[in-house]
Every structure is written in structure tokens, then in C-alpha cells.
Amino acid sequence: MFEQIIKAYPNVNGFMNVVLSDNIEIYGEEHNEKLSNTSIYSKIVQFLNKKKLSKNQPLLLLEHPSLLCKFQNKNEIINFKRHGNGGIHYLFLKLIQSYPSIKCVDTRIELGYLLALQERKLQNSIAHIQTIEEVYPCYQILSDLRDQFKINEDYYTKHDILYRVYLENMKEMDENMKQLLHLISQYQNIKTKAAKLKKLKVVKDSLYDLFIKCRDLSSYSVDVYIISILLHNPDRKIFVFCGNKHLFRIFFFLKIMTDRKFQLFNDQGKVVKITTKKPFGEHFTNWQKIDYSI
């Protein structure tokens, strides 16, 4: 499918990157970026609709909430049209009622994690903290989220390498929480206003780092689910549409977990060479300690 799309629309930026293997195509987008032209995604819809009656119809994985993988009524369709942008939004709207082999792979609601709207609200609250009292409710939300990660530990144990990443993330998160509580304790013993303001900034920075770690581990749950599906269906033609950050992490893990060849392309069909083996952002500093060997 990728070759046909690039040939038809070589200069239309509908997606950011694509990962290809023999029977896997993974498309990465910038979430909620308004499409200037839906031609690429229209082509994808046409391609899949031609395949929907085939015995070997491709499986379509969309980064859409697993608990919201269908429309209950016409009002839901109308509301969905009004809210959201991007290729995944377009594909879900056009295919969910007609294409039989769709799986929604964003399990974050199902696992009890924060919604994207809740994450943005929490991030904004942290950014606008002006007193130490405002730190506590934000910390409590992140502490509860950390407990939820622990409750869901079995979810991450399906593949050893993926589980090791989960454990290192949890370890670093716990260290961050311990450090944050220590900083709050130090703040309580400060007497001068100037020193308190300086320490409050340090507390905010530590709280924000904890937020990023929680957000990244929540996002990682999507990677785990997609990778599990790909590994358990080695002979099935599968198209994946997800955020670009998911694409890079999935690409990284598939290369070290399988002996299959995967190539990374940009939206112009040019091969992209990855010079770093770092699958996570700067906030996950323990990645080097993980033994990725099988």
C-alpha cells in the first residue's frame, strides 16, 4: 500500500514516518494535526475497502481508545466529526462501520490511566503552581497513577524485553517520588521568602519530571499492545496507524526482538537512518542499564 500512496502523492505530508516489513506497515502521525489534504488517507480508505471482502483482508490497528471502538448512535458520529483532527481520526470515521478487521489499540482508559484531556489539565496545573499547597493534589494524582501502573504489572510481562523496560521505568519513577518528598520536606524547614521561592521552583521541576515519567509509561502501554499483536500474527498483513513517538519505539523494539528486516521511511518515501539506539526521551535516563538481549 505504501508504494502506491507515495507514487500517487509524493509531495503530500499526510504522515510523518512509515516503518515497513514484509507484511507490516506502520504509519506515524503528529496527533490532532489538522490535515491540509486528506488525499493520502482517502487513498488508504479506498485501498482497504477493496480488501474488505477478501479472505486475507489486512488487519487495521488504530491508536483509538479500545473501549470506544464503535459508534453507539448517530449523535456520537456527529460529535466525533466535530472534535479531533488527523489521519487516525479520519480513518476511524470512514472505516469503523464498514471495514470488518479493525482493532483499537489504545488501552489507557481500559487500564485506568489518565485521558489525554486529563493529562493536559494536570500538566497545566503543574505549570501554574505558585504555592507549596498546590503541589499536593498534583502529587496525589501521580501517586495514584503510579499505584495503577503496579496493579497492571501483568499487562507488561508478556515479553521479557518489554517487561524490563517497565521495571526500569517504575524504578526511576519511585526514585523520583522519593526525591520529591524529600524536597517538600526541605521546603517546610525554610524560613526566608526568597529561599522558599527558589526551593518551590526545584519542587515544581521535580514534580514535572514525575509527570513526564507517568505520561511516558502510560503511553508505553499502547506500544506493548501493538507489539504483542504484531508478534502473535507473524503471517497476517497488518497496517498500524499511531502517533509518531509510538512508531519510533515500536520500530526500535521490533528490530531487537525479531530477526525480520524493518526499514524506516519519511513521508516522501526516502529511507531514514537512525543514529541513536535510545527508544525513550531524555526523561528516561535508566534506559542504558537495560539488557535488551534475548
Language-model-detected regions and their locations in the chain:
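Compositional signal for N-terminal targeting/processing segments
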Residues: 1-294
